[in-house]
């Protein structure tokens, strides 16, 4: 059951005391259990840049909602906590996960390692761009960013430094938060080399599959990217990896909607 932490309880009809938060989601566990589901996939919960959206509607600036522009890979999003105390989001998330587990529901995190909130070469400096731009991002010979994510940049995932960061991040969420699995957004970028070319045996994907601390977690690939690479049924990794099937999803959605074109595309 895929859900957005804020959106799932933000409306008053949810009936929770703490809408739009980890605590609010915890209040809805009986509802989730009644549905008979055995796992929830939380859309991105890492700290992200909510002000990256520069558009305005009726004179009010819109904010980033979905969470796919990560700023802090090791930190839960502070705006998802119900507590007034500072730095309580970690404890609140741990309590949510523990309660879900006690009710027989696993927790899978939607993680975004294909790009960051630093945008293109003209974007803001939050972290990696200032640490070592040449290491962390895929760059063209002219020094511009490869944009296989559609968000301005692409992480250089198979560089040893970046690979280690991703491994440490996943270990962190596995060991300290006890999550059960990860769904990797635009996972095909994780298999590109420093020139942006697809690799037959990407070091990162192999490391994730055989890392001892990750041996019991589920690994799920969204096996395509915005650069035209589509690898459903042919994702270059160990058999431990499962895949999202975008074409099947779209076909079923078209069928259920009665959309003949989408169901047959």
Feature locations, PLM:
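Active-site beta-loop-alpha junctions of metal-dependent nucleic acid enzymes
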Residues: 24
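Conserved alpha/beta catalytic core and glycan-binding cleft of carbohydrate-active enzymes
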Residues: 178, 191-195, 199-265
């Amino acid at each position: 059951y895929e859900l957005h932490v804020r959106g799932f309880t933000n409306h008053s009809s949810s009936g929770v005391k703490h809408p739009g938060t980890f605590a609010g989601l915890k209040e809805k566990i009986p509802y989730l259990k009644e549905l008979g589901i055995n796992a929830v996939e939380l859309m991105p919960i890492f700290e992200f840049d909510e002000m990256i959206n520069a558009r305005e509607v009726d004179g009010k600036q819109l904010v980033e909602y979905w969470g796919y522009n990560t700023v802090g890979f090791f930190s839960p999003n502070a705006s998802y906590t119900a507590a007034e105390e500072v730095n309580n989001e970690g404890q609140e998330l741990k309590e949510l996960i523990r309660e879900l587990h006690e009710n027989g529901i696993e927790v899978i995190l939607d993680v975004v390692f294909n790009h960051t909130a630093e945008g293109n070469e003209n974007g803001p400096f939050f972290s990696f761009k200032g640490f070592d731009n040449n290491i962390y991002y895929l760059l063209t010979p002219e020094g511009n960013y490869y944009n296989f994510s559609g968000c301005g940049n692409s992480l250089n995932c198979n560089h040893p430094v970046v690979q280690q960061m991703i491994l440490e991040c996943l270990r962190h969420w596995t060991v300290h938060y006890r999550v059960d699995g990860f769904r990797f957004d635009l996972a095909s970028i994780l298999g590109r080399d420093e020139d942006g070319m697809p690799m037959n045996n990407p070091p990162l994907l192999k490391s994730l599959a055989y890392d001892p601390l990750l041996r019991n977690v589920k690994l799920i690939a969204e096996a395509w990217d915005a650069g035209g690479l589509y690898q459903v049924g042919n994702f270059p990794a160990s058999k431990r990896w499962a895949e999202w099937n975008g074409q099947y999803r779209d076909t079923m959605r078209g069928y259920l909607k009665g959309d003949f074109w989408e169901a047959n595309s």
